[in-house]
């Protein structure tokens, strides 16, 4: 029997057993969703909010997280209407004309979708209509075209209102996110103990999926990027065989009760970092710690990212990998992505470090954000510098940089490193939710010496 067949047989048996012993999720309370709807009504100033259950985007039709946020359920072809008039009406229109699903929102009036065509023009006449623009075309088509809301006094996006609400997590949301984070941390610990030369990225991926399923969670994404794959910012997993001397860059997320975690870690396949790998790892870890230290209420949101970049560029200068830490083009060579975003109902949830708004926005208690600095050294990248940055620097400067940095860069070529934690902003500072996933070199190397039952199965 092939290795993949043995692995699948093991997972199938394990999941059947776990299905019998893991309790089902408890029914969720309607109260948080009712409170959110009331908050929207309070913000639309007598207007009418129209939130479809599904949105169209380049990847096709997707369930609206805003709709779920306000109702606690996903329903196809439904529209939630919140009227900010004196009656404060909350009406859900769907095909059945009745609620179909668990956790019935008792305060919602449910009507047939066919009623919406006649209801909406009257409800919004001379009032502000707040709509989800990404889903507006599909909603209007179902209602008979743009004439359905032509009588509104103004047509405005609902997204800013919902983003502001979703940005601050309730205690229930934080508890759910913590569970999702704990599941992901457990998956990381399992692969930390199991990973060894001769396994494949897919073998590691299978352990992660098993751990998620054990807790009735599913993967929101899984990156197991080893060796030369580790220098890719976004990756999945392949049948590539892990080799001694490789690092693996993990980027893992688990959906639990509609919320997702997001944790990145980097480990050495051999169980011990090489000196060069350790230098890069400690630099990235130092940058992350400095950024997390600054993630406190009242701090301008961009400051943690800027602090992490400063630590990285100064450290790269000490290693001989940059000649001028203040050079914009040298920054672009090494800083290849933003260092964080919000998490919640979406992996990138209504908030990102790279948003222009974050240069003025301040961090607030209840936000849950990632911090994920990374450095990547693809082989051959330095040779591309003269063509990559010819518009930013002279040919002489670029060639001199390559000549000076090239021998140093060669020592680190093929190394990728990213470290990501999920951080809750509190009233007095912050709390890292993902501490159960080891990130100190000594802890990683110690844990990689521990036995794993998966090594008896995946051979």
Where are these regions (language model features)?
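Bacterial N-terminal signal peptides
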Residues: 11-23
